Amino acid sequence: MFVDIRDFTPFAESNTAEDTVARLNALFEIVVPAVVDAGGHVNKFLGDGALAVFGAPNDLVDHADRAVSVARLILRRVDERFGGALRIGIGINTGAVIAGTIGGGGKLEFTLIGDTVNVAARVVQLTKTTGDALLLTQSCIDALAFRPPGLINRGSHALKGKSAAVQVFTLDPEIPAST
């Protein structure tokens, strides 16, 4: 799962460094606890975004359901905290990843690599094109134990580095998650 702030560059250009960092930290204060409370792990912060994983390094049978539930929670909490002053996109993909500690020269870092991660990164960028706050890949939908209400097919999209188009879906924000 990738979380990315929309239109962050103009905000950073028109605000102080302190305000910019405070805005990022305010978002991450929402993202990190939501992910961790659901058994996930925030792998890294990437500028104005974050990469979270459910099911690595420890396997979670319901990883896709947890990711979708957390994404909805993050979107709701961001809206409650910021209103329209901060817009984010979330992209979720499901599949095998290579997870491990890499590095050298005394600097080691747990990281995730592979096609699944790359597709999730491309899908979060696709939210800017579709205008959706959340996009899920077909792989994510297929891994769900429970199909969420309000699922909307956004069609197949060509993604950089992929020979085949990737089917994506969003969730109608007006339809609440089932309890």
Regions found by a protein language model. Give the residues of each.
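Catalytic strand-loop-helix junctions within cyclic-nucleotide turnover domains
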Residues: V53-H63, I90-F110, L126-T130
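Short flexible coil/turn linkers enriched for glycine and charged/polar residues
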Residues: G84, A96, G104-G106, K160-S163
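Helical mechanochemical/support elements of P-loop NTPase systems and associated helical scaffolds
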Residues: T20-R23, L27, L46, H63, ...
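Cytosolic regulatory/linker segments at or just downstream of nucleotide-handling modules
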Residues: A120, L126-T179
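Alpha-helical scaffold within the catalytic cores of cyclic-nucleotide enzymes
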Residues: N25-G40, A56-I90, D115-V124, Q138, ...
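Structured core elements
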Residues: M1-F2, H41-K44, L51, R87-N93, ...
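Nucleotide phosphate-binding site architecture
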Residues: T9, L51-A52, I98-A99, I141-D142
